[in-house]
Amino acid sequence: MSKVKKNEEALSEVLVDVNRVTKVVKGGRRFAFSAYVVVGDKAGRVGAGHGKAKEVNEARGKAKQAAKKRMMKVPLYQNRTIHHDVVGKSGAAKVILRRAKAGTGVIAGGSMRAIFDSLGVHDIVAKSIGSTNVYAMISATFDALNKLASPKSIAIRRGKKVHEISVKSYIQVNK
């Protein structure tokens, strides 16, 4: 079995939204379906995609392929939460993501919960402000996730060592 197949099997898929859309033509109405899917490996990689087709299953398949193409790696703290608080925006939607202590759980609504479950986050507090449109909320959540950075990546970017920028490691080194 190839690596692509193994990765494909490990991905979890969540159908976030399905819409029936209509195109009015001279002869009447043409119906089609629009689907939005979130895909993740529950280990720090997640993506979202949109697909349109005449049948729901075809739209879902197209959305899944689009989500796989748009997958991104998110740095997780102890493989359970995010490293720091962050805010994401998309249009009128605003999302605030806050790290949480172990055992807190996923406190998030709707489409944000689907993203965190697919991502593999176990402890997070998320608040949405403004628009509750599914597309805008997912876009704002991905904007916030793109802003996340681990102490290691920040240290590399600044040309320093991790213990020089991380408060906890600084305290441990200078005890």
Curated annotation (Swiss-Prot):
<keyword id="KW-0687">Ribonucleoprotein</keyword>
<dbReference type="InterPro" id="IPR005324">
    <property type="entry name" value="Ribosomal_uS5_C"/>
</dbReference>
<feature type="domain" description="S5 DRBM">
    <location>
        <begin position="11"/>
        <end position="74"/>
    </location>
</feature>
<dbReference type="GO" id="GO:0003735">
    <property type="term" value="F:structural constituent of ribosome"/>
</dbReference>
<dbReference type="InterPro" id="IPR020568">
    <property type="entry name" value="Ribosomal_Su5_D2-typ_SF"/>
</dbReference>
<dbReference type="GO" id="GO:0015935">
    <property type="term" value="C:small ribosomal subunit"/>
</dbReference>
<keyword id="KW-0689">Ribosomal protein</keyword>
<comment type="function">
    <text>Located at the back of the 30S subunit body where it stabilizes the conformation of the head with respect to the body.</text>
</comment>
<dbReference type="Pfam" id="PF00333">
    <property type="entry name" value="Ribosomal_S5"/>
</dbReference>
<dbReference type="InterPro" id="IPR005712">
    <property type="entry name" value="Ribosomal_uS5_bac-type"/>
</dbReference>
<comment type="subunit">
    <text>Part of the 30S ribosomal subunit. Contacts proteins S4 and S8.</text>
</comment>
<dbReference type="InterPro" id="IPR000851">
    <property type="entry name" value="Ribosomal_uS5"/>
</dbReference>
<keyword id="KW-0694">RNA-binding</keyword>
<dbReference type="GO" id="GO:0019843">
    <property type="term" value="F:rRNA binding"/>
</dbReference>
<dbReference type="InterPro" id="IPR014721">
    <property type="entry name" value="Ribsml_uS5_D2-typ_fold_subgr"/>
</dbReference>
<comment type="function">
    <text>With S4 and S12 plays an important role in translational accuracy.</text>
</comment>
<protein>
    <recommendedName>
        <fullName>Small ribosomal subunit protein uS5</fullName>
    </recommendedName>
</protein>
<keyword id="KW-0699">rRNA-binding</keyword>
<dbReference type="GO" id="GO:0006412">
    <property type="term" value="P:translation"/>
</dbReference>
<dbReference type="InterPro" id="IPR013810">
    <property type="entry name" value="Ribosomal_uS5_N"/>
</dbReference>
<dbReference type="Pfam" id="PF03719">
    <property type="entry name" value="Ribosomal_S5_C"/>
</dbReference>
<dbReference type="InterPro" id="IPR018192">
    <property type="entry name" value="Ribosomal_uS5_N_CS"/>
</dbReference>
<comment type="similarity">
    <text>Belongs to the universal ribosomal protein uS5 family.</text>
</comment>
